[in-house]
Amino acid sequence: MIDSEQLKQHMVKAVEEIRATNPMAGSITNTVTIDFVANAQLAVGGSAAMVYLPDEGEALVAGGGAIYLNMGTLFPIYEQTIPRAAKAAHDAGKPWVLDPVGLGIGSLRTQLVNHRTRQRLRDHRTLRPVGS
């Protein structure tokens, strides 16, 4: 377990690395926070791109260093987009974050999380921590 000073040092190092490399961390995010997410990425020196379509999600993973998947405002197309982007990131060994906003509200959110969990168990792989 790391203490607060170590956490602060890790955060400073991460921001310095981001500013030095300007990585693309794409997002499939909800309409409520899309501006906030993009501005947060830009503020620390990253590059931001937001998409909705499955093929664009896969392309964003291929061209970027990581992807953020937010389930806050789901559109029917996300039933394809989120699993395909997560699988593309997983298969490429790239970090990805699933933000399960509202999990348990409606069947689509639960279905998406269950699908990724089953896929991950079948793959018998673990995700790399961000920055490794």
PLM region spans:
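Glycine-rich phosphate/adenosyl-contacting loop at the front of the ribokinase-like
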Residues: M1-M50
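Short acidic loop-to-helix transition motifs that present clustered carboxylates
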Residues: Y52-G57
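Glycine-rich phosphate/dinucleotide-binding loop and adjoining beta-alpha-beta core of small-molecule
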Residues: E58-S132
